[in-house]
Amino acid sequence: MPRTSGGHLGPDPGGLLSAPCGTVAGMSKAEGTFDIDRFDTQDPHDDRDGVKLARAHITKTFHGDLAGTSETDIITVHTENPAAYVGIERFDGTLRGRKGGFVLQHEAGGTDGVPWMTWKIVETSGTGDLAGIRGEGQIIIGADGGHSYTLDYEL
């Protein structure tokens, strides 16, 4: 994935801008933004035949319905285009005033030239007031490089 000078994913990280996601019936919707505080990449650990596999560690600060911090570990695959990644993120903070945490499973890539970035709450990973949380959503990277999120969830 391309990196900007700040070390984070740019406005179009290898063609990974996400597609719109609607609210799932019976679920609440959380929305907001997040800042990437650190984006530490490692050199590719597998680089052959035009395909590179690499790892990165990311720390974030969330604003909006989710307020708190997270740590994420991802494995990326770099090809001509689109790039892709999978990852695990642990969030700690509040969701609309409820204190706790949960783990998100990330997946991103492209299908027929249409990029997407999704995340899903790992079942039974909720803690504190967020125990029992379930849901899924998406990450959106704006044209200005800003990051926002949506999360359809139920408690």
How would you label these PLM feature ranges?
Residues P20-L155:
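Beta-strand-enriched cores of mature, soluble protein domains
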